[in-house]
């Protein structure tokens, strides 16, 4: 039996690794510093604004592909994944005359968007992140070209667009198996039904260099 005792995602001495161990064992006396911060805000509207500000700051530092905003819920509040994605997309990939968009229908996508696959499709797996490189129109159909990296450029027609969603913010569940230089975590009492200790542990351990929690300290499990 091989036992792995060393944490490789975070550096030695990382508060992220330390606090993850504490949370796993039910100890909420966390250690804060430059690599692990908590920004107090019990108000959802204020929290959404704070997360947007932190996201922009972290993207400038690490790049949009190395930063994730994690939230327990996909919808229902101002700090849910769907609402945050729309706002973040407007901040980092605003519309312009040079960027084609999908027009009409329920799925609005834009050239330059960071997107996530939500279904397995050939060599593209559920949860894979890509970037929209081109949007073409073929009669009444629209073709969206997504670069998932490693030479995987895939085409999605109008009837396949539901297989894509914006990927600036994502649920903690969807983030499992991924890692980022910086993660911003939405932690609110309004989401308490979802805030289990394993979920908080999973969210924290997605970060390699920085973890920023925004929300209500009372929501910590």
What are the residue ranges of the model-derived segments?
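Conserved helicase motor core of P-loop NTPases
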Residues: 1-122, 133
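C-terminal accessory regions
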Residues: 128-139, 143-221
């Amino acid at each position: 039996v091989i036992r792995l005792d060393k944490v490789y995602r975070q550096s030695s001495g990382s508060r992220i690794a330390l606090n993850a161990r504490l949370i796993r064992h039910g100890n909420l006396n966390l250690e804060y510093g430059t690599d692990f911060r908590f920004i107090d805000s019990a108000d959802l509207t204020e929290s959404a604004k704070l997360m947007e500000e932190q996201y922009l700051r972290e993207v400038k530092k690490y790049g949009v592909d190395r930063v994730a905003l994690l939230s327990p819920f996909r919808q229902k509040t101002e700090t849910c994944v769907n609402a945050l994605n729309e706002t973040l997309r407007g901040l980092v990939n605003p519309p312009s005359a040079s960027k084609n968009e999908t027009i009409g229908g329920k799925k609005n996508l834009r050239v330059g968007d960071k997107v996530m696959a939500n279904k397995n499709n050939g060599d593209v797996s559920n949860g894979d992140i890509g970037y929209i490189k081109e949007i073409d129109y073929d009669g009444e159909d629209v073709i969206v070209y997504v670069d998932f990296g490693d030479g995987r450029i895939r085409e999605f027609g109008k009837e396949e667009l539901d297989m894509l969603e914006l990927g600036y913010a994502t649920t903690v569940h969807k983030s499992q198996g991924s890692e980022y230089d910086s993660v911003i975590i939405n932690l609110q009492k309004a989401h308490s039904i979802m805030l289990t200790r394993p979920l908080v542990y999973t969210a924290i351990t997605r970060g390699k260099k920085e973890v920023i929690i925004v929300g209500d300290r009372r929501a910590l499990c």
